[in-house]
Amino acid sequence: MTTKLSSFCFLTHGLAGISCEREHGSSRRFFYLPSRRLVSTSCKMRQQRGFDSSKRQEVKKGSPKPILSINSGLQSNNDEESDLENGSADSVPSLKSDAEKGSSIHGSIDMNHADENLEKKDDIQTTEVTRRKSKTAKKKGESIHATIDIGHDDGKNLDNITVPEVAKALSLNKSEGEQISDGQFGELMTMIRSAEKNILRLDEARATALDDLNKILSDKEALQGEINVLEMKLSETDERIKTAAQEKAHVELLEEQLEKLRHEMISPIESDGYVLALSKELETLKLENLSLRNDIEMLKSELDSVKDTGERVVVLEKECSGLESSVKDLESKLSVSQEDVSQLSTLKIECTDLWAKVETLQLLLDRATKQAEQAVIVLQQNQDLRNKVDKIEESLKEANVYKESSEKIQQYNELMQHKVTLLEERLEKSDAEIFSYVQLYQESIKEFQETLESLKEESKKKSRDEPVDDMPWDYWSRLLLTVDGWLLEKKIASNDADLLRDMVWKKDRRIHDTYIDVKDKNERDAISAFLKLVSSPTSSGLYVVHIAAEMAPVAKVGGLGDVVAGLGKALQRKGHLVEIILPKYDCMQYDRVRDLRALDTVVESYFDGKLYKNKIWIGTVEGLPVHFIEPQHPSKFFWRGQFYGEQDDFRRFSYFSRAALELLLQSGKKPDIIHCHDWQTAFVAPLYWDLYAPKGLDSARICFTCHNFEYQGTASASELGSCGLDVNQLNRPDRMQDHSSGDRVNPVKGAIIFSNIVTTVSPTYAQEVRTAEGGKGLHSTLNFHSKKFIGILNGIDTDSWNPATDPFLKAQFNAKDLQGKEENKHALRKQLGLSSAESRRPLVGCITRLVPQKGVHLIRHAIYRTLELGGQFVLLGSSPVPHIQREFEGIEQQFKSHDHVRLLLKYDEALSHTIYAASDLFIIPSIFEPCGLTQMIAMRYGSIPIARKTGGLNDSVFDIDDDTIPTQFQNGFTFQTADEQGFNYALERAFNHYKKDEEKWMRLVEKVMSIDFSWGSSATQYEELYTRSVSRARAVPNRT
């Protein structure tokens, strides 16, 4: 807004204004200052742009000091003196100023506000007034230059400038010899009155401008509130704020310069050149203010992009779930391969012994064969001798005929007789030798047969004497599934199935021997043999059925699959009967299921007012018996190519939950515990108590575990009726109604209310979800049912994650022999091209998904801070969030050939094992972590964790510098606040401990490697919960 004033500004000869103190000073006074000339007056008022928002708070501490200056020039030629003392004494009104509104004339007011929306300006353009030269005025004249500087007035009026004062000033000139005529004096008085009118108009224009400024200031206050809100969201712009702080210092310097200029303005200004320099300085300030405004616009645009980030995170995190699935699949494959290797090693030893015995027997057989061949040769020689003897006998008979004929014939006969005697003796010797060889051969054959018989007896005896407890769980699960299959196919009675199942449960030798005996017989004979074993023993264990959407390694997306498999195996080892019921997905790992087959029966379940058939498959996974349900529904619920992420997930899993309970009912099973997991099977709890307990499936207590309260599966209340539940009864605030809307239901809330036991994956997370922030709307429900709600820390598969047997490592090691850890560290440095010049340089590892939940801003900061502290840093992981992935790709390029930093933006199973084994320190700076596994794996491999105190991290990592924690539990370094300062404190302490005392550090490594993070302790806690709940149920027969 610009207001032009077409008026004259008059200043008396030698009149100058002096500004007083800043904001709370006294009223201003005018003084007479000598001057020699009158010059043209320029009046200008402009509202300047504000400073940058980062400087706003500093500016508010002190009120601005606006300057209103009027340069008036009055050019006159005086020919004669005049007596002013008798002139009229009309008063000239004083000029008023309001420093708080920020007006200025021939100056500038810096409002010190940085709101880009404030575009209004008040500009009182320059008005130059020059008095016409009097025709009679002399050419000699002096110019009087005066400057009135009106400062802060605090609402008070300035002293008036009156005509007598002007006359008095003019009389001073008269005393110096100048002459003013009466005509000139009258003309001068006319000009003074005209100036009074113009000054009044100037006051009115100023008042109008001040009103506009009031409106602008009110707009500023509203915008200031919005800016305060935006400032709280600028956590990612800390570096820009620091830059703004530097600019603030620059502005303060400029303010000091302005203050000096203000004081200099108090003194008379002797030359127009000084005013020109001052104007240029003001123009420079304006340009700087424009630059600051552009910075604010840039910050605001970046803030808008930050707001969109949160909305994309949830969608993009789902894309990472596939990576986690492949990781867990590889882990399970490794576990199976290790079990196979251990079994092969035993078989190899037995095979070696048998080969040694066979080789001994082969030698004996070869020796006996040679002896037999020699005996055969002797027999052939004997046969030749016998033929010769026969011929001789024939000759003798002929000779007897001619016996009497000749003496020669008689002598010949005597000679022949002697030869025969010799031949007979030789024959006897040959017979003796042949007999000895044959006897020796028979003895060898007998010894060989005895050896074979002894080996057979030893093998049979070993098979009979082998303890039944040493049989693998796959064997017992297969036997259990066989019994269940006969029951579902109605080939045995329900009571007989219960008794046989109980014998399997107890690993009864009789059922084992029977199974071995009938293994090759037909099914009818096998069933008859099994039914002969039926008895009524009592069982000491629990019968637990898990109904879940995932199970590692066959159908795994996240930690849920690990819990179902790990907890199931741990409970099985404790002597409990454990079964799993899963959907039969088309995309699951079928090669990880042993003895998978379909039963010759179907189970019908209700959905959408109809009965649908379900095909039942059985098999063993990791030694656990598993039932797979394949719905014969036209929607092909689990034939979609993925586990989750379908539009009808609510319908898919509510159908599966009812079909699972129908399977238990129709098979006649009587479990003690039905354990359901996450929202996908949360429907089991209300279905069990509302529909199936009245039908006779009433032996079980319901346990529900929520692995992440971020996912609650809410849907329209009308969809709940598809599985047969009463919508009117359950869509209530005290049942399943979601807190967000009255027409939506929450399966997780229903499971919490209808379950007998409710658990989550760590004690700290159990406390966090009972708050409004962590509970995601369920905190009040959890607090109401707090007596049955508990957090149990998950475990890890210590067979797969074992540095003593890990095949991915360059060298295996354990807590008693850490030499292998140094070898793995050297191997990793060589593999990644890192410097090995200093073997004691600490190596910091990080394996994670690069998502906001994992604290990516702290991970990024850790890279640079590790270098500053003299360490090396290795990162393995990728991000489903595009801008995060791009950011870390840029950092990767920055350190591509660096000696101490390497970023690997992918997931590599083998490399992850090596990083765990090689790292000295391992960072987990998560913002939010229900349980977490990496800290446990890191400690298992001798890497000391640096973790934020949240969720499961707070339950597994305890600071070694915290004296309130017993020494035996201290195992890492922790920090509370999710900022760089908190993280730096923990990282620096870790480096100091590492470098200060090597021997003490090695003892710490040995200690953390010895900590038991297996499923054993967790399974014991679940076992206690199960037992207490079942005991209470049996004590109260009519439970609800």
Curated annotation (Swiss-Prot):
Q: Where in the cell is it found?
A: Plastid, Chloroplast; Plastid, Amyloplast; Plastid, Chloroplast stroma
EC assignment: the record states 2.4.1.21
| Coiled-coil regions, chain positions | 187-466
Residue positions binding ADP? K556, G559, D562, R849, K854, K906, D908, Y916, L933, T934
Region annotated Disordered sits at 43-142
Q: What is its main location?
A: plastid
Task: Give binding positions for (1,4-alpha-D-glucosyl)n.
Answer: W679, Q680
Biological process according to GO: starch biosynthetic process; starch metabolic process
Q: Which InterPro entries match?
A: GS/SS, Starch_synth_cat_dom
Give the UniProt keywords, A-Z. Amyloplast, Chloroplast, Coiled coil, Glycosyltransferase, Plastid, Starch biosynthesis, Transferase, Transit peptide
Q: Give the transit peptide range.
A: 1-42
- Stretches of Basic and acidic residues bias are at 52-61, 112-124
Which GO terms of the cellular component aspect does the record hold? amyloplast; chloroplast; chloroplast stroma
Regarding tissue, the record states: Expressed in leaves and flowers.
Similarity annotation:
Belongs to the glycosyltransferase 1 family. Bacterial/plant glycogen synthase subfamily.
Assembly and interactions?
Answer: Interacts with PTST2. Interacts with PII1; the interaction is essential for the initiation of starch granules biosynthesis in leaf chloroplasts.
The record's function comment reads: Probably involved in the priming of starch granule formation. May play a regulatory role in the control of starch accumulation in plastids. Is necessary and sufficient to establish the correct number of starch granules observed in chloroplasts.
Q: Which PANTHER family match?
A: PTHR46083, STARCH SYNTHASE 4, CHLOROPLASTIC_AMYLOPLASTIC-RELATED (PTHR46083:SF2)
What the entry lists under HAMAP family is as follows: Glycogen_synth (MF_00484)
* Protein name, entry field: Probable starch synthase 4, chloroplastic/amyloplastic
Q: Which organism is it from?
A: Arabidopsis thaliana
Q: Which classification does the entry list for the species?
A: Eukaryota, Viridiplantae, Streptophyta, Embryophyta, Tracheophyta
User: What is the gene called?
Assistant: SS4
